[in-house]
Amino acid sequence: MSMILFASIVRVRDGLPLSASTDFYYAQEFLECRRQLKTLAQRLARHPGRGCAESCDFLIYFSSSGDVACMAICSRQCPAAMAFCFLEALWWDFIASYDTTCVGLASRPYAFLEFDSVIQKTKWHFNHMSSSQMKSGLEKIQEELEFQPPAVLSLEDTDVANGMLNGHTPVHSEPAPNLRMKPVTALGVLSLVLNIMCAALNLIRGVHLAEHSLQVAQEEVGNILAFFIPSVACIVQCYLYLFYSPARTLKVLLMLASICLGNAYLHGLRNTWQILFHVGVAFLSSYQILTRQLQERQSDYGV
């Protein structure tokens, strides 16, 4: 019998199932385990990182990072390192196929059911490959588990099966792993320098105008905000380029719109070339942010 029986991808914040393996077992114990997995999925926001729970004759493993979690039902003969190795491989494959915006906007269960083909392929590999073929990946996961043990949940003690948590069972959660971005490019460095320069220019002009307006009139408040808001947006663009953030596309569009609208509002205080320069830098930075992706995971799991 296979050691990994079922796998599911869920959204952490609300437990919405995004995809799952379509093979099915009709044993009563397995059906009960499936029901408990669905209930547990709704509580993953309280248990970040890795964890497991016993259910009938099976074990439920889960591993979450960001707003995506992978869950699996395994036989008791399945080593924990192998289960978490499988879940991590599945997680990398999923985020490589769907960005955080798609995940966040999903409104119906199993919106990415076509990912089942990847789940089936990955599950087959782990069920049929020997430990020696996955040695490097298993050793890495085993070291992580020894350093930071996964949360061990008791479905009965925590009343997860009834949709409640009584809060008496201690849970040792693991922080989500750091997501590494691809290396910074020369054009990316240029966009950072130009962004910082634009932020400084906006800040200086805004402060100067604020000091002048406080002494003369109050009708310049709109112009002051039109300097300060793009200044903050430029700094946020620098952050989005350097560090991974969920819903990057939405944030990039918001920052770009703030800079464009702010400069359009300042048409009377800036000439056309100055406005084009600031807007051009904003578009360059937005492009650099959206094209700098997460690093490819190393293929050390034999998948």
UniProtKB/Swiss-Prot annotation:
Tell me which SMART domains the record gives. Answer: Longin (SM01270)
Against SUPFAM superfamilies, the record matches this protein to: SNARE-like (SSF64356)
Bilayer topology reads:
Multi-pass membrane protein
Question: What are the annotated GO cellular component locations?
Answer: endoplasmic reticulum membrane
Domain Longin, by residue range, is: 8-119
Instruction: Give the main localization category.
Output: endoplasmic reticulum
Q: Name one Pfam family in it.
A: Longin
For this chain, the annotated S-S bridges are none
Tell me if Metal-binding is a UniProt keyword of this record: no
* Top-level division of the source organism's lineage: Eukaryota
User: In this UniProt entry, which residues form the Lumenal topological domain(s)?
Assistant: 205-223, 270
Family note: Belongs to the synaptobrevin family.
Q: Which PANTHER family match?
A: LONGIN DOMAIN-CONTAINING PROTEIN (PTHR46258), VESICLE-TRAFFICKING PROTEIN SEC22C (PTHR46258:SF2)
Q: What is this protein called?
A: Vesicle-trafficking protein SEC22c
